């Protein structure tokens, strides 16, 4: 048996309906689209969300919220990703050099996820309580 010889069991698959192939099929001539009208035409139909000219629900409801500009330049760094950084001192530039965060990031916060084995010194980064405990348990320290 080879992959190119595999086929479904006989009778387990239905052939697709072939529309517009003669009156005897029951789907000839208009091919199940009825007579005239927008939906019978090629490319016919309305876009999703169109309500026939009535003011759509999306526009009837008010706008809400905003996108924080600071969130676009802030990153969360997991504790286990600190292992990718060469050297003992970890700051924003060290994270960028190790490709842990992208170049446009201006703020980073270290969060507890995974473990760290070696002692490191974290400088100028925000650190959660859990991440702080994990770093200090490994013999590292945090400098503000």
From Swiss-Prot:
GO cellular component, one term: cytosolic large ribosomal subunit
Region (Disordered): 1-54
Biological processes annotated in GO: translation
Alphabetized GO MF terms: rRNA binding; structural constituent of ribosome
Keywords: Ribonucleoprotein, Ribosomal protein, RNA-binding, rRNA-binding
Biased amino acid composition, Gly residues: 21-31, 42-52
HAMAP family named among the record's database cross-references: Ribosomal_uL15
UniProt record similarity statement: Belongs to the universal ribosomal protein uL15 family.
Family annotation (PANTHER family): 50S RIBOSOMAL PROTEIN L15 (PTHR12934), LARGE RIBOSOMAL SUBUNIT PROTEIN UL15M (PTHR12934:SF11)
Task performed by this protein: Binds to the 23S rRNA.
Subunit structure: Part of the 50S ribosomal subunit.
The protein, known as: Large ribosomal subunit protein uL15
Gene transcribed to yield this protein: rplO
């Amino acid at each position: 048996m080879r992959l190119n010889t595999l086929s479904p069991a006989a009778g387990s698959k239905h052939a697709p309906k072939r529309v517009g192939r003669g009156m005897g099929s029951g789907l000839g001539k208009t091919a199940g689209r009825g007579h005239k009208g927008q939906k019978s035409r090629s490319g016919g139909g309305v876009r999703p969300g169109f309500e026939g000219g009535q003011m759509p629900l999306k526009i009837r409801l008010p706008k809400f919220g905003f996108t924080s500009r600071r969130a676009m330049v802030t990153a969360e760094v997991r504790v286990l990703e600190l292992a990718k950084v060469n050297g003992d001192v970890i700051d924003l530039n060290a994270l960028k050099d190790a490709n842990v965060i992208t170049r446009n990031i201006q703020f980073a916060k270290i969060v507890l996820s995974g473990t760290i084995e070696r002692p490191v010194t974290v400088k100028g980064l925000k650190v959660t309580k859990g991440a702080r405990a994990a770093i200090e348990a490994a013999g590292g320290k945090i400098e503000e």
